[in-house]
């Protein structure tokens, strides 16, 4: 079992955080980098560590990969290499001892109802894989339902939330549109936002500010193809990278 992770000298503190994560993860890790490393680790030096990481994953030289501390451009390169319709990233957070999925967390994802419904289905399947039980789903939008009419943008997102929840219910899922009430949504297993900006902002508030433990964000569309890639923020702490490495190994069967 070989799991790759990348770091770039362009990201402040990247080497220190990633190397600490490798020590803590208890996983066989290959570090992709473009800096001088003074560490006893398996390493691949490349001009573009993120691209090299994706190439080795797609070509089967790695069992799984974690983005690590490099530009998010490598996620787009994964999408292109696998010809994916979208990434479908879903962050795995710990909330009161439970694994809760947040999706979408890519700022350019989830802006159409059809893609949100597909992402909800992918996230539900992924949660079943993690927990072996049926998930409950909360759809989060832009206000309380009684806030219709206050502003056209709010109305549109509320309407999208209602429609997504209805369509997922028609597919046999346990779903509720909770409006803007994130505090209620976190009591469910899957939290589905009506666009990726809301999802990304919520992830940053919960994980990078409030200290909720993050295990990274698997690219669910790739996982459906049998390819394990866990996205992470380049600002993540070493402990977060270590959890992402362990999740990647778990998903790859290690």
UniProtKB/Swiss-Prot annotation:
Enzyme nomenclature, EC number: 2.1.1.-
Superkingdom in the source lineage: Archaea
Transmembrane segments: none
GO molecular function, one term: methyltransferase activity
GO biological process, one term: methylation
Enzyme kind, highest EC tier: transferase
Keywords: Methyltransferase, Transferase
Family membership noted in the UniProt record: Belongs to the MtxX family.
Protein name: Uncharacterized methyltransferase MK0941
Source organism of the structure: Methanopyrus kandleri (strain AV19 / DSM 6324 / JCM 9639 / NBRC 100938)
Source species taxonomy: Archaea, Methanobacteriati, Methanobacteriota, Methanomada group, Methanopyri
